[in-house]
Amino acid sequence: MTAVVNIAAYKFVSIANPADLREPMLEQAGQRQLKGTVLLAPEGINLFLAGAADAIEGFLRWLRADARFADLQAKYSESARMPFRKLLVKVKREIIRMDHPAIRPEAGRAPAVDAATLRRWLAQGRELVMLDTRNAFEVEVGTFRGALDWRIERFTQFPQAVRDNQAALAGKTVVSFCMGGIRCEKAAIYMAEAGIEHVYQLEGGILKYFEETDGAGFDGACFVFDERVALDAALAPQA
């Protein structure tokens, strides 16, 4: 059986009229029989799609022909069956809701650490605060060993959690992480703007870490928002 290719991708970039992209996105993804969700907002694009390998690559070529998305990077995994039931393209206020409009990731990112570098830091025992920016129910499925978990129920609670815990992070090196990179990017920017000096974001999130390393230092599986539920370090649905 031919495996279904799954991609997760996002990019913070100004989109003046995101509603104008909805129909072209539906048409291009639909004609390739892709399923999943695409979120569009003035701050950018966030997508989770699945389908045949050539269809996925064809859609990405079409999307990257738009200069705004030319350098969009995708995280890949495979599954034995389609993990989504339908195709949705939605226009939102934010591609990841924080309810903090002053945070504009496209205006400048926090420093990022790539998967291989983080793997090396963890193996060396480097002093890090691994901060899980995901919801509590996601953390319960799996997280980095010893990670800090503020037990938030939704990402809009993250700014208050920073205010409540900021003193404990003073002088420490913080690596924010999440499923695919989008939440940890916003989180890292917020913390840096709040005055936390040494903040990194895990480039591409847990999924990219699994894709590019052996998953060392991560206990359990990564929760995903589709019918696969959770992926292990080999990016296979957890048994």
Curated annotation (Swiss-Prot):
Alphabetical GO biological process terms: tRNA modification
All residue ranges annotated as the Rhodanese domain in the record: 124-214
Matching InterPro entries: Rhodanese-like_dom, Rhodanese-like_dom_sf, TrhO, TRHO_N
Reactions catalysed, as given in the entry: uridine(34) in tRNA + AH2 + O2 = 5-hydroxyuridine(34) in tRNA + A + H2O
Pfam families noted in UniProt: Rhodanese (PF00581), UPF0176_N (PF17773)
Keywords attached to this entry: Oxidoreductase, tRNA processing
GO molecular function: oxidoreductase activity, acting on paired donors, with incorporation or reduction of molecular oxygen
Active site as annotated: 178 (cysteine persulfide intermediate)
Enzyme Commission identifier(s): 1.14.-.-
Function: Catalyzes oxygen-dependent 5-hydroxyuridine (ho5U) modification at position 34 in tRNAs.
Family: Belongs to the TrhO family.
HAMAP family assigned to the protein according to its UniProt record, in alphabetical order: TrhO
Protein name (record): tRNA uridine(34) hydroxylase
Originating species: Bordetella parapertussis (strain 12822 / ATCC BAA-587 / NCTC 13253)
Gene designation per UniProt: trhO
